[in-house]
Amino acid sequence: MEYAPLGLIGLLTPQANTTVEPEAWALLPTGYSLINARLVSQASSLNQRLLDYVDQLESSLLQFANAPLSVLSLACTGSSYLMGCDQESQWIEAWQKRLGIPVVTAGVAVARALQTLGVRRLDLLSPYDQA
């Protein structure tokens, strides 16, 4: 593919997220490109929206139509927190088999990066409340 000779990333972001796309473009190595689609939900509660993003993935994927994706990336850590590691791993494995391409979530990507860097302890500061 002319504009993505090394790979085309399908990036799924939450419906109102304004940061993932510019950050992804800034970090993207030469030879790769990405296309973005939105994860959407009509749920009023945040937790239900985050779960809807995962449960309704198939309809979100329709936005990519027949784009020749090399990898699918779900850029939503909140969904990972609610699924938990075991369910997330099963979900990823099922979608990889179905799509025939690697699938990665933001949560798994962060965990892999920390492991690769040898991080054993991490302090976390968050603007979110306990809910």
Predicted regions and their residues:
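Conserved beta-alpha
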Residues: W95-A131
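Short gly/ser-rich anion-binding loops that grip negatively charged ligand groups
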Residues: A43, N47-V54, G78-C85, G100, ...
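Short, hinge-like loop/turn segments at secondary-structure boundaries
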Residues: L51-V54, Q90-W91, R121-L122
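Gly/Ser/Thr-rich loops at beta-strand to alpha-helix junctions
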Residues: T13-T18, C76-G84, P127-A131
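N-terminal glycine-rich anion-binding loop in soluble enzyme alpha/beta folds
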Residues: M1-S59, A131
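Glycine/small-residue-rich loop that forms an oxyanion/phosphate-binding "nest" at active or ligand-binding sites
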Residues: L61-V108
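Residue-level preference for short coil/turn positions at secondary-structure junctions
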Residues: A4-G7, T30, P68, L99, ...
